[in-house]
């Protein structure tokens, strides 16, 4: 890259980041500095990727942290000589854009594209080493045509199906939510509305077909945070157990199946509990019981977001325990879920705390069948006994260890036809149907004669209609657009209708990382050869909030498309970094529960509410408008420069921890960059003039330089960016203290090395000072320096002197001293003479580099 036409003949001590950053960003763009190099057989690759943003319209500090971290990693590996792919795109479909467009009375497409344009310009202010030629948005037709294509690939593989089911309905956003999009309080992850149940015909993906592989392959992800793997493990929720069939006493042909991981407690079953929608409900004839069940249904619906009472309704139904033929009463219970297992559970109050509490409340028998010790007698329990032990009250299994009895009772059940070994998962198939406009249309035609018919690739894309009606505070759903919906069946040719559901936005983000290596490919979603070269992503960076949704779906997509022979990779992301939140001080009035804007507070060191003079609590919380603690990245960049913002973000906290914003810390990084600027300005004035040369100073600088190279390299590889900057500061101090006392060759080498080490963190100022000291090509085209291990060796070491095993003195020893010289030196020391004088020295033991022990 050619240096800009500028002569550094007159220098200023003023560091002007705005001028420097604009200049270099323009030059980098003009020279295609960050265009991805083609991979060859001999080149190493590195694929660095941030989770792509939703184009909300404005960059926030959480974005800045995410993209600066990824950029640092990408730059480092480019310096290491690798071909780096570092792209950017936009997760552009979804309800927020649709709702924002409705509020403004414009098309979601227009709104989204405006936001993308603005956010792109904001991102470019950060000086990211992104290959912008590969940019796309998921709402682009030339992207979502391939989302539709991949949907059809999964359809052909039998992984897509449609069924009528009770779904999670968001009454505010008027759409269906996947289980993963409903929080623990039963509220929508997006709108916060209490989720309702509704019966609709929906499209699903069979993610459960991959449950076992998704679980097992977590073991391969050595470079993922353990907490993310645990979250996925728990969400998949594998249980190994037994399905046990209980016959109804009034109808022996009718079975009630329960899943249990504790067949050893089968003799202790004193009731069965079923859900309010279980198929056995039809056998209940008592009208009072039926009404109680209806009331319980309403209670469950109204209290979806609350902790449920353990409500039970005893029915007239009786089951028969298959192992001992005892009659077992059947209850309808509030805690039994329709969607998990069989919708029925066996109640063992003596050995399950939930069952124990339910039994106590409803006066159900409690029968203990496991004891801690064979000689122990049963007493009335005050809580469930849940430990291992020995069976009792269990016929031929009495006194058998319960861990063995589990297997034996299961075997008896399987042999006699009333049990089946079963693996069960908490994971449910992925519901992808959404009843809104702004999403990827599903490429299916509904025909009265042929049913649901998938389109051919040649008939794609099914494009969203542009003639939309924005009225009555909503955009009409696709089903209301007669011009768009009416079509002909691709199979039989009669009049038919397009599918009116759109896809969950996670469909688009489950494969976007596969598009970047061949983003301009026009006849398929990606080039197989490019996927096999570039994937998996070497470093993926994003928030832990995506641990279950996006990351699990992306893993599923990768495995499903692999099985369709579209590529050979098993996992999409080799290394995952989940960065913490960016927090800032928020001022809360605990009396009113309201937050107060810092601009309304007279004294931030002693904050009080200007309205009622109440002392305010200072909390560090995630930045948000409602808490008045948001920091605008553009204003920070305007005041201090992008390099300062980058340095602060990287230095303030380890990347996986939450970061607390502090103006003082930002100013500290700005001052550090100013000191660097002044040092290089002064050096540039007489870069070729001879300096005084002091060997001790030179040796010290060489050592500092090599320590910096070694430590910063290791810190970046280990995502310890804050300690890397600390090492950079140490090297700067050594450089500044000795720069005028070393020979010219070392001076230039040290200045050059510091510049390269600084460049991934603060790329603009590094580029500027690189050219200040006379280099013509970009610093970002240099190679990362290697450290010299010899330079790190000490000339001397501290030797501990012992007399009869007790420490009596310490002395500095040169590395080149012989054992005889060491003995002579230590024996002459006053502190040693007083312990050895007039005594016989029997033996001297030397552990080289550590200890000398004189035995007297």
From Swiss-Prot:
It is an enzyme of class 6 (ligase). Signal peptide: none annotated. Its EC number is 6.1.1.4. It is found in: Cytoplasm. Its main location: cytoplasm. It catalyses: tRNA(Leu) + L-leucine + ATP = L-leucyl-tRNA(Leu) + AMP + diphosphate. GO terms for cellular component: cytosol. A motif ('HIGH' region) lies at residues 53-63. GO terms for molecular function: aminoacyl-tRNA deacylase activity; ATP binding; leucine-tRNA ligase activity. CDD domains: Anticodon_Ia_Leu_BEm, LeuRS_core. ATP binds at residue 625. A motif ('KMSKS' region) lies at residues 622-626. NCBIfam families: leuS_bact. This is Leucine--tRNA ligase. The gene is leuS.
């Amino acid at each position: 890259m050619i240096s800009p036409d500028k002569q550094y003949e007159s220098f200023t001590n003023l560091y002007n980041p705005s001028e420097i950053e604009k200049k270099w960003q323009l030059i980098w763009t003009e020279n295609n500095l960050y265009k991805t190099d083609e991979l060859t057989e001999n080149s190493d690759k590195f694929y660095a990727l941030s989770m792509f943003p939703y184009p909300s319209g404005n960059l926030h500090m959480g974005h800045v942290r995410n993209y600066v971290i990824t950029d640092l990693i990408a730059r480092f590996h480019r310096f290491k000589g690798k071909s780096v792919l570092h792209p950017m795109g936009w997760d552009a479909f979804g309800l927020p854009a649709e709702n924002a467009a409705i509020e403004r009375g414009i098309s979601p497409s227009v709104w989204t594209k405006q936001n993308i344009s603005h956010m792109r310009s904001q991102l470019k202010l950060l000086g990211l080493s992104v290959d912008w030629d590969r940019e796309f948005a998921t709402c682009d037709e030339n992207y979502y045509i391939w989302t539709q294509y991949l949907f059809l690939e999964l359809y052909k593989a039998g992984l897509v199906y449609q069924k009528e089911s009770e779904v999670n309905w968001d009454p505010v956003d008027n759409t269906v939510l996947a289980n993963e999009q409903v929080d623990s309080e039963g509220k929508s992850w997006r709108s916060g509305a209490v989720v309702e149940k509704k019966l609709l015909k929906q499209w699903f993906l069979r993610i459960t077909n991959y449950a076992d592989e998704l679980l097992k392959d977590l073991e391969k992800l050595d470079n993922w945070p353990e907490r993310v793997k645990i979250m996925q493990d728990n969400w998949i929720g594998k249980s190994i157990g037994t399905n046990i069939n209980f016959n109804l006493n009034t109808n022996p042909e009718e079975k009630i199946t329960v899943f249990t991981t504790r067949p050893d407690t089968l003799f202790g079953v004193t009731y069965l509990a079923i859900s309010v929608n279980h198929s056995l409900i039809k056998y209940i004839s008592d009208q009072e019981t039926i009404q109680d069940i209806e009331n319980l249904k309403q209670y469950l619906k109204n209290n979806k977001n609350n902790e449920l009472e353990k409500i039970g309704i005893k029915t007239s139904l009786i089951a028969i325990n298959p192992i001992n033929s005892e009659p077992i009463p059947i209850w309808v219970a509030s805690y039994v879920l329709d969607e998990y297992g069989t919708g029925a559970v066996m109640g063992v109050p003596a050995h399950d705390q939930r069952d124990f509490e339910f039994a106590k409340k409803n006066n159900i028998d409690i029968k203990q069948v496991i004891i801690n010790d064979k000689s122990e007698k049963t007493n009335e329990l005050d809580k469930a006994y849940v430990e291992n032990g020995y069976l009792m009250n269990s016929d031929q299994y009495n006194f058998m260890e319960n861990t063995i009895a589990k297997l034996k009772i299961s075997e008896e059940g399987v042999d006699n036809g009333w049990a089946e070994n079963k693996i069960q998962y908490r994971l449910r198939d992925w519901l992808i149907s959404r009843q809104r406009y702004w999403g990827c249309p599903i490429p299916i035609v509904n025909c009265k004669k042929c049913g649901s018919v998938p389109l051919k690739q040649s008939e794609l894309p099914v494009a969203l209609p542009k003639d939309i009606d924005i009225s009555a505070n909503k955009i009409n759903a696709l089903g209301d657009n007669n011009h768009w919906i009416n079509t002909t069946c691709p199979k039989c040719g009669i009049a038919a209708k397009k599918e009116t559901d759109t896809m969950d936005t996670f469909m688009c983000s489950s494969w976007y990382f596969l598009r970047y290596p061949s983003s301009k490919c026009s006849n398929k979603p990606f080039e197989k050869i490019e996927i096999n070269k570039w994937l998996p992503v070497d470093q993926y960076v994003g928030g832990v909030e995506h641990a279950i949704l996006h990351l699990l779906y992306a893993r599923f997509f990768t495995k499903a498309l692999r099985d369709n022979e579209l590529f050979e990779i098993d996992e999409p992301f080799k290394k995952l970094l989940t960065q913490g939140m960016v927090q800032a001080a928020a001022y809360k009035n605990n009396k009113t529960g309201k937050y107060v804007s810092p601009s309304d507070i007279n004294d931030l060191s002693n904050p009080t509410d200007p309205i009622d003079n109440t002392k305010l609590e200072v909390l560090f919380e995630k930045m948000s408008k409602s808490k008045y603690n948001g920091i605008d990245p553009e204003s920070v960049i305007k005041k201090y420069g992008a390099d300062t913002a980058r340095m602060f973000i990287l230095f303030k906290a380890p990347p996986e921890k939450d970061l607390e914003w502090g103006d003082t810390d930002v100013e500290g990084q700005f001052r550090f960059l100013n000191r660097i600027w002044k040092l290089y300005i002064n050096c540039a004035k007489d870069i070729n003039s001879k300096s005084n040369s002091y060997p001790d100073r030179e040796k010290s600088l060489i050592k500092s330089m090599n320590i910096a190279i070694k430590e910063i390299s290791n810190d970046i590889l280990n995502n310890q960016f804050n300690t890397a900057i600390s090492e950079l500061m140490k090297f700067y101090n050594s450089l500044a203290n000795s720069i005028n006392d070393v020979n010219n060759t070392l001076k230039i080498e040290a200045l050059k090395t510091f510049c390269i080490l600084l460049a991934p963190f603060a790329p603009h100022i590094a580029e500027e000072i690189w050219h200040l000291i006379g280099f013509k090509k970009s610093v970002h085209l240099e190679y990362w320096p290697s450290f010299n291990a010899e330079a790190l060796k000490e000339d001397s070491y501290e030797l501990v002197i012992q007399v009869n095993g007790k420490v009596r003195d310490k002395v500095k020893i040169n590395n080149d001293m012989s054992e005889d010289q060491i003995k002579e030196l230590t024996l002459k020391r006053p502190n040693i003479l007083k312990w050895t004088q007039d005594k016989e020295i029997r033996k001297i033991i030397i552990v080289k580099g550590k200890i000398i022990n004189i035995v007297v």
